[in-house]
Amino acid sequence: MDSIPVIDTHQHLWDLDLFQLPWLDLAGMDVLRNSFRMTDYREATRNCPIIKSVYMEVNVHPDLQRQEAQYVLALCEADDNPMSGAVIGGSPGESSFADYLDEFAGNPFVKGVRTILHDPDRPRGMCLTPQFKENIRLLGDLGLSFDLCMRPAEIQDAVELVDACPETRFIIDHCGNMSVQPDQQQDRAAWEAGMWRMAECDRVFCKISGIVATATPGTWQPADLKQNIDFCLDTFGEDRIFFGGDWPVCTLTANFESWYRALLWI
């Protein structure tokens, strides 16, 4: 099994000398308040058969989104690392988004856009404004995808957005962000219903990523992740799921190799 080549579809990097990441100031983020560069990623994955990776935007300060995109696209162009594409940051709720996107949409390394919907200052329904929907439809016109990263209780918002953008591909990050903690299951019914509903649309894909960060540091076991992962496999089927390492965010609870090997066990 270890010999199967792996594409990591959710690779983060950040250089705190270049970028401001406001969310690193939140409680519990101490281990992430460092720079994480390509050399660090290669060391973290050296015992795993990663052959390619796709950069995932890191929720930089909005004023730095253009600079972040330029930075990672330069890495994609280099031949000394596995990065072969990027999902760049952007602000689809803003009228300036179309002009911003025009700068990058022709770059073959740009695969899609993400904006985080679950930050504390981002209210429910943020992705349902007319401006937001218009800009997500624009992504579809350009052959680009949109990554959904939101609170599990609000997944019905994603259903409405998908329905409103019939030509756009969507990727659900982190299995829909449903926690694996037994005492945090109050949103499970809404999450399951929303995931089933989105799985009915063949333009929606599910990324097996991120959920290890909701496990208990130091004591978690692969079995703790199995219920959520099995649900996603059963709901979307093997042709519409893929792996994302979510490094270095996964290091809140696990190193890359232990997370990867947990998935092999599952």
Regions found by a protein language model. Give the residues of each.
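An N-terminally biased module of ancient metal coordination in phosphate/nucleic-acid-related enzymes
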Residues: 1-74, 261-262
